[in-house]
Amino acid sequence: ADCQAGDSADKLLAQKQHDVNYLVYKLYGDIRDDHLKELGETFNPQGDLLLYHDNGASVNTLMADFKDGRLLQKKHWFSLFNTRQREEALMMHRVLMNCKNWHAFVSNAAYFRTNMNEGEYLYALYVSLIHSGLGEGVVLPPLYEVTPHMFTNSEVIHEAYKAQMTNTPSKFESHFTGSKKNPEQHVAYFGEDVGMNTHHVLWHMEFPFWWEDSSGRHLDRKGESFFWVHHQLTVRYDAERLSNHLDPVEELSWNKAIDEGFAPHTAYKYGGYFPSRPDNVHFSDVDGVARVRDMSMTEDRIRDAIAHGYIDALDGSHIDIMNSHGIEFLGDIIESSGYSANPGFYGSLHNTAHIMLGRQGDPTGKFDLPPGVLEHFETSTRDPSFFRLHKYMDNIFREHKDSLTPYTRDELEFNGVSIDSIAIEGTLETFFENFEYSLLNAVDDTVDIADVEILTYIERLNHKKFSFLILVTNNNNTEVLATVRIFAWPLRDNNGIEYSFNEGRWRALELDRFWVKVKHGHHQITRQSTESSVTVPDVPSLQTLIDRADAAISSGCALHLEDYESALGLPNRFLLPKGQAQGMEFNLVVAVTDGRTDAALDDLHENTKFIHYGYDRQYPDKRPHGYPLDRRVDDERIFEALPNFKQRTVKLYSHEGVDGG
């Protein structure tokens, strides 16, 4: 074969990829791989307890509930916010995390795929592949092809069923929810993008709110990461709104009506349609979840903590948050996650708000409706109220960040290093293009009938490739390690009024963050848009992953899917917001900071992927997310006088309906 022959590790990885592909292919039917199907039917999880690090404690717990018939049946919806369903998924997750080798892992996965609820199983499988060393290098098949009904309008799913029944290969156009009468529909391409939905759900798998360190390890900067990823989603959504002549999103308020209703036009695979919410609904108490006044009280306690500058811990001590690590503790109590310093007192503002919003169509449970779109991370960004909820959270975080002392010139300067100029090679131009994905997993079928190809296509934003050209001078006599931080924010609001530096920097979109060694003298840094560490490329389709893994197994070649290993990051196609046909002005800012003092670990520049968490999952950059724009700026002259900081106005063009190069 014309390829690089794989070693034993490569061969095992190709086998793992093959196994994972078939563990999720046709999720709601029988396993289509003979070996895995046999494991699913004959493997006894309790047959050899030496297969597990915990000597079988986790598997005994799960099997006891399974044998007692206590587990959720198959063909039923699953929501992570449902306490019992989450616990069942986590029981399986603990079994997989305790497997000593791939044989044990895949045998249990095949067994529970055959015997457990599909949603619980899929969640446990993906979270375990992300967090277990056994899953390293495995590419997670795109969720929009594994569970297409969570990402695709039900009208299209019905068409897919018809095509399957008549055995007709078909391709259907998908449309975004709502009609042109609804102004929110103009930005549906962002909230309803299949890659954006996947980014959101995978981030919450990488940093689950239920995680405790007994699960195996500490998740570095989890609370701060919760703030930052949702802050970026919020400011990017606002940039898309401005691109479409809409005002930035208003924050949600517990005592005001939720202006925008939402009709999801999506249905559960089993369990009926996702509930709708009419316009102008006032918040109602939700039976068994929370009262509206509890939510206001929780918010007041969090704001009090910010005003006091400390969090009351469970043991009565005070945790000081008036420093760059305060955001970490604050994120944990706002979400709230298993790391919260005092869940009893500070409640669970974010998670409960998701359920409250999801249930406003049926707050008393009178109609016994299934969970709303906000009760699933896969579907929540489809509802415009998701961004209103996160604007509300974001403003609480901002209150904290604005209470911190602004950075001084001494703190921001990089001795001997200056930026001479910043430029862009190529044009900043976006366009829409059709994106296809398979609906094969959406339809039921039997092994005897051959599958026909059923695809859907939908418009997705993308941009022409471009590069940043940054000219720097190093006047030190030695080579230095520099961290390059690139941001941009919309220059004006929807009324054409220019944002002040302090307003703009809070609205800044992070475009890239990377290390580079700079020798003495002048140096040009060229960075391509495709290299951005804040984004990831679209993952290959499930069929492509199947073909690639099977080809690697039969040829003995290495698989080479490294580019898709980490799913953490925005879809690369969304690196730039849409912009406007006549050009929309953005303020582009570049800061070059001292990589040696920024690095949380030594020799880290060898691993340039910031977002991918570096060695052993420790976050490589010890500066706060958003640095140096994360604190308020009372006097922008400090930044204007910094040699290692540069800004310029750039124009971002949207090329409606024309394919770009």
UniProtKB/Swiss-Prot annotation:
Which UniProt keywords are present, listed alphabetically?
Copper, Disulfide bond, Glycoprotein, Metal-binding, Oxygen transport, Secreted, Transport
Glycan-modified residues: N476
Q: Sorted alphabetically, which InterPro entries does this protein's record hold?
A: Di-copper_centre_dom_sf, Hemocyanin/hexamerin, Hemocyanin/hexamerin_mid_dom, Hemocyanin_C, Hemocyanin_C_sf, Hemocyanin_N, Hemocyanin_N_sf, Ig_E-set
Q: Which residues bind Cu cation B?
A: H350, H354, H390
Q: Which GO terms describe its cellular component?
A: extracellular region
Which PROSITE patterns does the record match to this protein?
HEMOCYANIN_1, HEMOCYANIN_2, TYROSINASE_2
Residues annotated to bind Cu cation A: H200, H204, H230
Q: Name one Pfam family in it.
A: Hemocyanin_N
Q: Give each disulfide bond as a residue pair.
A: C3-C557
Q: What does this protein do?
A: Hemocyanins are copper-containing oxygen carriers occurring freely dissolved in the hemolymph of many mollusks and arthropods.
Task: From the Swiss-Prot or TrEMBL record, give the protein name.
Answer: Hemocyanin subunit
Name the source organism: Scylla olivacea (Orange mud crab)
